[in-house]
Amino acid sequence: MRNKIIEIAKQNGADIVGFAPADRFDKNDPIFQIMPETKTVIGLAFRVLRGIYRGIEEGSTYYQYTTMAVENMEETVMPMAQLKVAMMMEAEGYIALPQRRHQQIMAEENSTNPEVAYDAVYRGRTAEVQMNFLDAAVKCGLGEKGLHNTLLTDEFGPMVRYCFILTDAELDATDVVKPHLCDNCGKCVKACPGHAIDENGNVDPWQCAVYYNGANGTKNPFMPLDAFDGMEDRIEIIAGEAKVTPETARKILDKIYFYPPAQHAYQCSICGRSCDMACYVHLEEKGVLTKKFKTPFRKREEWKFDIEDWK
């Protein structure tokens, strides 16, 4: 059964498959609220194509990241792999409950998800129990937790997305990865165009949303010179130096019309996950990633516009 799961998952796009026995999770973990009879959590990780990030790295094409690395992965590729595995398991008589991210549903009352439009998020939905995805990924042996609260894998660094299947089948466990990739260099923190990550790796979701969507004009080739006219702290916003609140974040996001959203409420990422790119470049330069390429990801000094253009 275990080998068949791995085979089907990889045939349908998964790159890494891991298994966590139920006893790795606290008795109050959400997985047992979702499915009390859970015996194993199956983790599936999928690479995000390195080439998709190159357009943002070069400042030449942005839509491919949002549509191909986020939307199609979350809405098509990953669910298909989950369903194929789950259908095989249920054909064998086991329960298989796929778990994907609820991009527009959250238990918190005043948080947000940078990847989707803030006004498309349904907040305070505590009845919809959700897994701790990063914690489950680590327990499934998919990778380790990086400083900026991102999964790091030996093959692809932070360039992965992942999902799970809960099952009552008892399957042999995958070893938990001993942390060895993240050296707390802080490059992810420094790379954020909106200073949304503190020195301990904690991410402010509203700060992240504003600059994920492109409020930093020095890293946004689509921003007009009259952007945010009339707003207090306009230059600080464009320079990535403004500290936003949930209220001011909403006002800023309402004025970001530089690029159209994708379907399913996914917002176009103008920052391109700068934190992840900086992390990947660092890991590649250290030579610790097992997936090798013929040329380095970063080929030249990072580009940046002059803030004086907006003054």
Residue spans for each PLM region:
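Flexible loop/turn segments at secondary-structure boundaries
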Residues: 26-27, 199, 286
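Feature captures the RNA virus RNA-dependent RNA polymerase
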Residues: 13, 94, 309-311
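C-terminal non-catalytic accessory extensions
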Residues: 285-311
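Catalytic cores of enzyme domains
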Residues: 73-281, 291-300
